[in-house]
Design a protein with these regions (language model features):
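A short linear-motif detector with a strong N-terminal bias
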Residues: 18-25, 37-41, 71-72, 108, ...
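Core catalytic region of metal-dependent phosphoesterases/phosphodiesterases
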Residues: 72-163
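Short secondary-structure boundary segments
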Residues: 27-45, 100-102, 106-118, 169, ...
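Acidic, histidine-bearing metal-coordination/catalytic regions of metal-dependent phosphoesterases
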Residues: 1-58, 62-72, 78
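Residues at the starts of beta-strands that form the adenosine-phosphate
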Residues: 58, 90-91, 126, 168, ...
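Short hydrophobic segments within beta-strands
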Residues: 62, 95, 130, 172-174
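Conserved catalytic scaffold of divalent metal-dependent phosphoesterases
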Residues: 47-52, 66-69, 100, 133-212
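A short alpha-helix capping/helix-coil boundary motif
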Residues: 58-61, 121-124, 192
Length: 212
């Protein structure tokens, strides 16, 4: 029993150093921990039965930031958010993995810093997020609290309906698609395909059912 306690403490010490690196600089490892370029994909989706508006609904989906994995990660996140803002989104969906472990350098990037950057994304219909597996490993409560403090809705086996003119889009957040809870099954069973965006982790198990 004592061995398990010591092992668990060691694992926590390795994977959960303090949230104290405000910039994500990685300390002495800065030069060898650069992130690769991020990927932007544009899709135009048409839904049968929906009107063809003069201003199509613009949805931005951002995911897998892993902030803290690379040097200057906060500046990298700021750049991604600036690019997303240029698309003038109507709705923002955040797919989780906001943080990652920081074995080297000054410590992990505080969730409040990440949430403050993401809050710069203005969207008339709001921002909605699910947590990823890294978020659960390295501080789900802290991350969810930080996002909510910046008016970002976190969907944890929950759904929300967004009114768009005379139509509605149902957002369903399934945080961990590997372990589908009774609540998850209930939410998925009640989906209306014409109006639902389903999102879960990992993403290859769920696809957007409808979006435009």
């Amino acid at each position: 029993m004592l061995g398990k306690v010591l092992r668990d403490r060691l694992i926590r010490a390795i994977t959960r150093p303090p949230f104290r690196d405000e910039l994500g600089r990685k300390g002495r490892f800065e030069r060898i921990a650069r992130a690769g370029p991020h990927l932007i994909r544009r899709l135009r989706l048409v839904i049968d039965g929906w009107p063809r508006w003069s201003h199509p609904l613009r949805v931005i989906f951002l995911s897998d930031f892993h902030t803290g994995s690379h040097s200057d990660d906060v500046a990298r996140l700021e750049g991604i958010v600036a690019e997303a803002r240029a698309f003038t989104p109507d709705l923002v969906l955040l797919g989780g993995d906001f943080v990652n472990m920081q074995l080297f350098g000054a410590g992990r990037v505080p969730p409040k810093v990440i949430a403050a950057v993401l809050a710069r994304l203005d969207a008339r219909y709001g921002q909605f997020a699910v947590l990823g597996n890294h978020d659960y490993l390295y501080g789900a409560r802290e991350i969810a609290d930080a996002l909510r403090a910046h008016a970002i809705t976190v969907l944890d086996d929950e759904s929300r309906s967004v009114k768009v003119k005379n139509h509605s889009i149902d957002l369903v957040g399934i945080p961990n698609a590997r372990v589908v809870s009774a609540r998850s099954k209930q939410l998925l069973a009640g989906l209306v395909p014409e109006s639902t965006v389903g999102s879960g982790r990992p993403w290859n198990l769920y696809r957007p059912i409808a979006a435009t």
